[in-house]
């Protein structure tokens, strides 16, 4: 103790009229039997705004947003016709309490029971390796990611599989889907030589490794294609 007294004043503002939007894209499945089943990729589009200076959010989560859009564009423009439906979503309001992802599960565009897997991408834009957080019971879903990495991407890969049955931190979008019984694999990067400032003005594009983002697009695209084609997704 320094035996000192301090007075602290906080000035805050609440804007209940604020509106955010989820952004959704879909490639409809072509197989009469499998098309109702859905493979998803998602991540949050928002950052923390002005606090009071601009917070760029290049890694968190500009990186994940770009990867999802890249995978969606690659598959949509390739002429590929998936058997299962592929759904891509950018959530609003993750930083203010998972608002966008919670809205989606409360007002789903597809039946929640039809979603066979969600790949949640957050802060995958630095370092050299790709990490996957996965609950133990979703080892079969994780195997598609590992196969895509081993065959096409060939990045150092690690997973939390076997550590526990908690899919991810409860303050990330994947947790909202996990609580509904949907298999979730949360993808991120590891191995950065320089720590990227978290929720800080220093989270800028100059720190981003575009090579690993390119490989992440390839990983997500390939995994979704593979899962779309199998006769049955084993969970």
Give the location of each predicted region.
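C-terminal soluble interaction/assembly domains
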Residues: 74-81, 112, 160, 178, ...
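Second-shell loop/turn segments in exported
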Residues: 10-14, 52-61, 90, 128-138, ...
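His/Asp/Glu-rich mid-to-C-terminal helical/loop segments that flank catalytic regions of hydrolases
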Residues: 73, 189, 194-235
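Structural recognition of the beta-strand scaffold that forms the well-ordered cores
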Residues: 23-26, 38-42, 87-90, 116-121, ...
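Soluble metallo-hydrolase cores and metallopeptidase-like ectodomains found primarily
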Residues: 1-57, 73, 77-83
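Short acidic/His/Gly/Ser-rich catalytic and metal-binding motifs that mark active-site loops
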Residues: 34, 47-52, 127-129, 193-198
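Active-site alpha-helical elements of protease catalytic centers
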Residues: 58-71
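Metal-dependent peptidase/peptidase-like ectodomains
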Residues: 91-195, 232
